[in-house]
Amino acid sequence: KFVSINPVKTGYSAIADEWLGIRPGTDGLFVHSIIYELLKANKIDWKYLERYTNSNWLVYNNPGNSNHGLFAKDENNQPLIFCKTKKTILKSSEENKKPSFFGSYNFNGNNVVPAFELITKELLSDNFKPSIVADQTDIKENVIKRIASEIAETAFEKEIELPIEWTDMNGVKHDKMIGRPVSMHAMRGISAHSN
């Protein structure tokens, strides 16, 4: 399914399966509302986040301190995570770890939290509820919720599995590739707006 979210119904919007006429300059707000819904429904690819992103890396959470917002690193400049099974802070490159995406921890007298904790705190704000965003974007609440639901269904119930061996960035070999047949092409819209 091809959904076009654009203020005007020209070009690719005219041939899309569905066109959503959005108020100019609010596409970032719309995307935040989609993310809000996906977080609420727990439709998150945790394995992907764990393996291929820095969302579980610890961040200094010390407002007013010079290290606030920076990644916590060890003496060798290696990013750190909190391991749920070992109940301790480890290097992100450590093997046999189960990183936490949530929580607050102490590292050398500093408060640190996983980056995902900060992301969810921001994106689960009432500001991004579809009921609030609908009035600002001109896209109805039920449509925002439906689009989020369709993204989740396609990503998690229609995944693609390819029997192709590959090696990831950490040198770990895999016997198959998992694909989530969902994408978004934002063109210049999101980068050119303040929301």
Question: Residues of each region from the PLM?
Answer:
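Acidic catalytic cores of enzymes that act on phosphate-bearing nucleotides/polynucleotides
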Residues: I144-N195
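Long, well-ordered, tryptophan-enriched scaffold segments
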Residues: V8-A14, E18-W166
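Short, acidic/small-residue loops that bind anionic groups at enzyme active sites
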Residues: K1-V8
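Generic beta-strand/beta-sheet core signal
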Residues: I5, I22, H185-M187
